């Protein structure tokens, strides 16, 4: 399911680089990428049928539906400088965080854990996914392109107002705000230096990382009451890594 979402994402976003390598659509074209993504979706449901578990099918069917809703929501906000922080958070919950949540709940579900434990693991994954996506959006304005494995400024070129830019527009002076609005409307990647200056001036990267750390802390808090051990330590470490990677 995750791989299929990446194939479709790269087509929608017209991306040509992922994890430092050419995307499938850049090599084989959009049609092949969409069809292979569709195949992986259908294959995942074939595998679920083989498991013969209605709870698993219900969880993943709901999850894939919400991911699709998130992608549509994101499209509605492309080139929209009026995108609010609340709207941004709704998009990342649906397009990213719910897949994390499904993955973490599935482990509990497969092991026969009770409903309370499943809820804890689902909430952990949801908070982890939020933290991960915000940190990823920060990297689009701060990382080394080689280390990041994708082109810096892709979000800006696509007209996506992610949290750093949303915060900068809300806290810039009026003249800067109007210039930033125009950049978002045009999807003007050539204006990256001006955008970076505005983001730095407003402290927007620091603000965004604080928000990511808040969600990472909430993810760890969701684990309270679960048995200590290597698995719990790994989950706590993953929450911290999701935010600290590349920073």
What are these language model-derived features?
Residues 1-247:
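All-alpha prenyltransferase/terpene-synthase fold signal
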């Amino acid at each position: 399911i995750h791989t299929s979402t990446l194939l479709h994402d790269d087509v929608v976003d017209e991306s040509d680089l992922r994890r430092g390598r050419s995307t499938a659509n850049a090599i084989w074209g959009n049609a092949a990428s969409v069809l292979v993504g569709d195949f992986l979706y259908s294959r995942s449901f074939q595998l679920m049928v083989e498991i013969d578990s209605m709870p698993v099918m219900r969880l993943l069917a709901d999850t894939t539906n919400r991911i699709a809703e998130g992608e549509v929501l994101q499209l509605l906000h492309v080139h929209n400088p009026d995108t609010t922080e609340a709207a941004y958070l709704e998009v990342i919950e649906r397009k990213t965080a719910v897949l994390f949540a499904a993955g973490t709940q599935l482990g509990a579900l497969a092991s026969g854990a009770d409903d309370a434990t499943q809820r804890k693991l689902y909430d952990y994954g949801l908070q982890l996914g939020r933290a991960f996506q915000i940190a990823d959006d920060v990297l689009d304005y701060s990382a080394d392109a080689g280390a990041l494995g994708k082109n810096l400024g892709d979000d800006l070129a696509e007209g996506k107002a992610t949290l750093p830019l949303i915060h900068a527009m809300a806290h810039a002076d009026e003249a800067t705000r109007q210039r930033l609005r125009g950049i978002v409307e045009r999807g003007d990647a050539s204006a990256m230096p001006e955008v970076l200056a505005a983001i730095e001036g407003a402290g927007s990267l620091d603000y965004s990382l604080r928000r990511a750390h808040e969600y990472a802390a909430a993810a760890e808090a969701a684990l309270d009451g679960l048995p200590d051990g290597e698995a719990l330590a790994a989950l706590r470490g993953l929450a911290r890594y999701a935010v600290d990677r590349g920073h």
